[in-house]
């Protein structure tokens, strides 16, 4: 008999709960998906045009491992302008294959076996499995709806042990749309410094905040040297398929992460890097137009959920809304499956984002207003039917 070819680590990890409903809806005619967190806009034309031009010019070879110098310079300028933090493009910035690679490389570079990583939930599905694959121990901090799923200093303090090394800060948050203001972040930063922790700040939705600007924890006093900032072009610039992100932080950490990136990836896609330079230099207006459209959809959904009397707070980040369905006495997966089967609309059960997401749904508004209105009509009908059956 052949030995088991698979590691215990990988067989113990469940596939993403997000993709399950996306795969199901793709097989249903007339179905609407509000499940995938991907912009419905085309990549801005100037970015695409630059990509075409660089291909025509034959710029199809490897770049340096850490990325094109001009791109890192533009990223440095962008971050100084947006989050008011200066990063040395030569030593403190590494270009990655999407923000997801940055998360993976950061955890693998910083964790020894048994190191604990604090992960507020509900949050993006990759943090826990990537921590496990890096031989770390994920420790979940359940966030509370009553305070808009924000992390508090008291919750953080209670979760810290002598083995704690890192805190993940997933804000603006997927799936809740929650943001952290400067006033929210300051007590968190004090706890982090007092316990000598590092922060992995996933800021991929930083371009998508409404009514208030994004604040990075790295901008607070004493935090740049203990924070790794993850960002990229997928969400704000509508470049999901270009697979381009970056990670910024102390040079002593970036230099070691570069080894993993070197051996596993070599470099991020050359064509995408040239295109992103154009995006950072010239596409701020297009990014603002997309943000305005998301904001219009956000306001529409908040109002519609209020009319349906589905409890949810008003989100000010990303492109998700996170209504409660606890009144119906079923799990979020049961609700989502019935909604899909009966009304042909896909949403993601909150449980896909951790146990504290149970009883909620993630509804993406990265879809046209026409699709949202049709989906809301079907949801209203479904909710009325459930309430009549009580």
Segments predicted by a language model, with ranges:
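PLP-dependent class I/II
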Residues: 3-6, 11-14, 24-28, 32, ...
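Conserved nucleotide-sugar phosphate-binding/catalytic loop shared by glycosyltransferases and other
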Residues: 57-59
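Intrinsically disordered, tyrosine-centered linear signaling motifs in cytosolic regions
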Residues: 61-62, 205
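Conserved N-terminal alpha-helix of the aminotransferase class I/II PLP-enzyme fold
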Residues: 62-97
């Amino acid at each position: 008999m052949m030995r088991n070819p698979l590691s215990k680590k990988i067989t113990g990890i469940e596939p993403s709960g997000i993709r399950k409903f996306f795969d199901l809806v793709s097989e249903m005619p007339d179905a609407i998906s509000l499940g995938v967190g991907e912009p419905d806009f085309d990549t801005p034309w100037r970015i695409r045009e630059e990509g075409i031009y660089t291909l025509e010019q034959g710029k199809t070879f490897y770049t340096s491992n850490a990325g094109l110098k001009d791109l890192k310079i533009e990223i440095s300028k962008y971050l100084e302008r947006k989050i008011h933090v200066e990063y040395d493009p030569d030593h403190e910035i590494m270009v990655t294959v999407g923000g997801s690679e940055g998360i993976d490389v950061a955890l693998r570079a910083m964790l020894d076996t048994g190191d604990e990583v604090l992960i507020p939930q509900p949050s993006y599905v990759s943090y826990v499995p990537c921590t496990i694959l890096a031989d770390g121990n994920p420790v979940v901090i359940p966030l509370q709806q009553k305070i808009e799923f924000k992390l508090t200093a008291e919750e953080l303090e209670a979760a810290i042990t002598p083995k704690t090394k890192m805190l993940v800060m997933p804000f603006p948050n997927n799936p809740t749309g929650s943001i952290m203001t400067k006033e929210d972040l300051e007590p968190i930063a004090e706890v982090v410094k007092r316990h000598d922790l590092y922060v992995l700040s996933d800021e991929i939705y930083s371009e998508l905040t409404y009514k208030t600007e994004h604040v990075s924890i790295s901008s607070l006093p004493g935090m740049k040297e203990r924070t790794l900032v993850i960002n990229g072009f997928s969400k704000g610039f509508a470049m999901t398929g270009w697979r381009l992100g970056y990670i910024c932080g102390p040079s002593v950490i970036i230099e070691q992460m570069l080894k993993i990136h070197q051996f596993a990836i070599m470099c991020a896609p050359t064509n995408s890097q040239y295109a992103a330079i154009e995006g950072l230099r010239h596409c701020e207006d297009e990014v603002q137009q997309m943000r305005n459209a998301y904001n219009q959809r956000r306001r529409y959904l908040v109002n519609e959920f209020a009319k349906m009397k589905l409890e949810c707070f008003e989100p000010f980040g990303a492109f998700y809304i996170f209504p409660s369905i606890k009144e119906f006495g079923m799990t979020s997966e049961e609700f989502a499956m019935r909604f899909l089967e009966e009304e042909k609309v896909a949403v993601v059960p909150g449980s896909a984002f951790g146990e504290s997401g149970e009883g909620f749904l993630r509804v993406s508004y990265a879809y046209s207003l026409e699709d949202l209105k049709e989906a809301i009509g079907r949801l209203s009908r479904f909710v009325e039917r459930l309430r009549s059956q009580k």
